[in-house]
Each structure stands twice: as C-alpha cells, then as structure tokens.
Amino acid sequence: MSELDQRGAVHGVFWTAIQSIGVRVFSLLVFIVLARLLTPSDFGLLAMAGVFVVLGDALVAQGFGAAITQREQLEPEHESTAFWTNMALGLALGALLWAAAPWIAALYGQDALTSVIRWLSPVIPLRGAVAVPVGLLQRRFRFRALAIRSVLAALLGGVAGMLAAFLGWGVYALVVQQLVGASLDLIVVWSAVAWWPKLAYSIRHLKDLIGYSSYLLGSGLLGLLSRRADDFLIGVVLGD
C-alpha cells in the first residue's frame, strides 16, 4: 500500500469513527429528551411504520450506491443511469407506501398509523436521491463530508423533533425528526458531491450495475428482514 493509500485509510477510519460516535451520542441525547415528552404509544406507532419505511429505504439505498463506489471502470452513464433508476424506484415505493397506509394500519389495528405512514413516505424518495451521490463521495474518499452529513442530520433532525415534541405534536414529533434528518442529509450530500446527473439513460450500463447491486441488495434485505421480522409480528399480534 502506497503512502497516499495509507493516509487515505487513516483519514477514512478517523472520520468514520467521528461519524459513528457523533451520531450515537446525539441520537441518545435526543431519545432521552423525547422519552420524557412523548408516550410509549407514540414510539410504538413510529416503530410500526418504521418497519415499512426502513424496508423501502433499503431497496433504494443499498445496491446501486455500493456498486458506484466499488466498480473499477465507472463511466458517467453508470452514474446517471443509477441515479435515475434510484429516483424512479424511490418515488414508486414512496407512492406505494402512501397508498397502502390504510391497509397496513388495518393489519396492525391502529387507525392512527395511516397518517403517520403517509407523512413518513417522502423519506423513501429522499433516501433514493442521495444513494448515488453518497457512493461517489465514498469512491472519492470524502469521508469528512459523509461524517458531517450524518452528524448534522442526527443533531438538527433531533432538535426539530424535540421542538415539535415541546409543542405537543405527539408522534408527529418523531415524524418531523425523520423528515428533517432526511432533508438535511440530502442538502449536505448534494452540496459536497459537486456532481449532477445527465439527462440520459443506458440499459447497457444498467446491466453492468445490476449484477453486483442485486447481490448486495439481496444480502442486505435478508439481514434487514431477520432483524425487523420480530418487530412486525409483535406489532400485528399486539396492535389491537
């Protein structure tokens, strides 16, 4: 490994550690405050909705972003095609979740869940819009920008959630936290990446990315389902 590569590795480890510690600390502090202002049922509603939001997030955030990061020969057409595919998928999944909200609420036996899910549904296209830029930042070893993005989203999203909780918004304070965090994530990433997609789409370049991204997506979804299946089943059984 060259000296430049070693410096890049050390730089990456340092900022990744800053990101991990910062997000954990701010998230914990925000949770402590929100736990004093909100009820367990508020957190329960968000957890029920979160199962589906996290699933949609995984579908748009995993796969293409990692393929952009790790593919050896990357052309502008790969980047633009991956971005437009992610945007279309994110919008479609967000719309599907919005439409399915009443049925999900009925499954859980929680009428209030319909509105919560619908307000959270924009998180999915917001995540889809940053997957490729994040992949490009990782490819360029821009770990400092990635760390700032995550810490700011956790901090300011948490502040927004706490303000909403102080105003008596109940479960929607948690929704505000998620929406503000995802929006700040989008703003910081796009400010840092210095890249714009072309108005072009290539099936050939899409096929180049699908093989690798489908493997990552499949393994990521299996891991996600194994972690969140219990949450879903408990919500269905105890929802009434």
Give the ranges of each region predicted by the language model:
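Residue-level signature of transmembrane alpha-helical cores of multipass secondary-active transporters
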Residues: 12-20, 50, 86, 119-120, ...
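Helix-terminus/linker motif at the lipid-water interface of multi-pass membrane proteins
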Residues: 28-42, 105-107, 165, 224-240
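Generic alpha-helical transmembrane segments of integral inner-membrane proteins
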Residues: 21, 25, 29, 33, ...
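Interhelical loop/hinge segments that connect adjacent transmembrane helices in multipass membrane
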Residues: 1-5, 9, 144, 171, ...
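Membrane-interface junctions at transmembrane-helix termini in multi-pass inner-membrane proteins
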Residues: 9-10, 67-76, 126-150, 167, ...
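Alpha-helical transmembrane segments of multi-pass membrane transporters/permeases
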Residues: 10-23, 76, 122, 136-162, ...
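Membrane-water interface segments that mark the loop-to-transmembrane alpha-helix transition
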Residues: 7-27, 45, 49, 54, ...
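Hydrophobic alpha-helical transmembrane segments
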Residues: 114-121, 149-195, 211-214
